[in-house]
From Swiss-Prot:
Pfam family, one: TGF_beta
Annotated protein name in UniProt: Artemin
Biased composition (Pro residues): 80-95
Keyword Signal: yes
Tissue specificity as recorded in UniProt: Cochlea. Expressed at higher level in sesorineural epithelium than in the modiolus region or substantia nigra.
Subcellular location: Secreted
Annotated organism of origin: Rattus norvegicus (Rat)
Residues that carry a glycan: 206
Length: 224
């Protein structure tokens, strides 16, 4: 490919030695000086035919470019580093194995949860305070009212609160060693009863406020 004055080429981007731009003007000056010296020494020795022949002009180097630039055959591909292949992504970490202490802690937590649920079930069956909405007319106190009140009461088992007397009484009754009085049977365990009460107020059908003391329970306990 011929190199022109206005054509940008990839060769201009290569590195060039510093001595080649100054070499060509020096050679041209030496050739001109040689021709002047030869003409001054023997002006008549040259024929008219030889005068018309121009002096030989040294051809510039093959890698010389106009404007004092020197071109070197090089490849941009050699200057560029080769493309690197993308690195494969590391595999995701697998699930960590559960250590024996963690497994033991999990088993203990499960047993503790079972015990706590069992204790909650026992507490639900035990003596405790409960509440329910009931009509005033169903209280049996002779009041006529269309209102509903929250009636709190005690219920549940007191087997865990039995004393040695209660345990012995139950054993004697079961074995038939103790004759119970006719028409009644001794109670071999305490009873779940209110230990505190509160007053309840409501309005009757005549728009009159009524208050009943010690009507609703506020605390429960095993008595007897």
């Amino acid at each position: 490919m011929e190199l022109g004055l206005g054509e940008p080429t990839a060769l201009s981007h290569c590195l060039r030695p510093r001595w080649q731009p100054a070499l060509w003007p020096t050679l041209a000056a030496l050739a001109l000086l040689s021709s002047v010296t030869e003409a001054s020494l023997d002006p008549m020795s040259r024929s008219p035919a030889s005068r018309d022949v121009p002096s030989p002009v040294l051809a510039p180097p093959t890698d010389y470019l106009p404007g004092g630039h020197t071109a070197h055959l090089c490849s941009e591909r050699a200057l560029r580093p080769p493309p690197q292949s993308p690195q494969p992504a590391p595999p995701p970490p697998g699930p960590a194995l559960q250590s024996p202490p963690a497994a033991l802690r999990g088993a203990r937590a499960a047993r503790a949860g079972t015990r706590s649920s069992r204790a909650r079930a026992t507490d639900a069956r035990g003596c405790r305070l409960r509440s329910q909405l009931v009509p005033v007319s169903a209280l049996g106190l002779g009041h006529s009212s269309d209102e509903l009140i929250r009636f709190r009461f005690c219920s549940g088992s007191c087997r865990r609160a039995r004393s040695p007397h209660d345990l012995s009484l139950a054993s004697l009754l079961d074995a038939g060693a103790l004759r119970s009085p006719p028409g009644s049977r001794p109670i071999s365990q305490p009873c779940c009863r209110p230990t505190r009460y509160e007053a309840v107020s409501f309005m009757d059908v005549n728009s009159t406020w009524r208050t009943v003391d010690h009507l609703s329970a506020t605390a429960c306990g095993c008595l007897g």
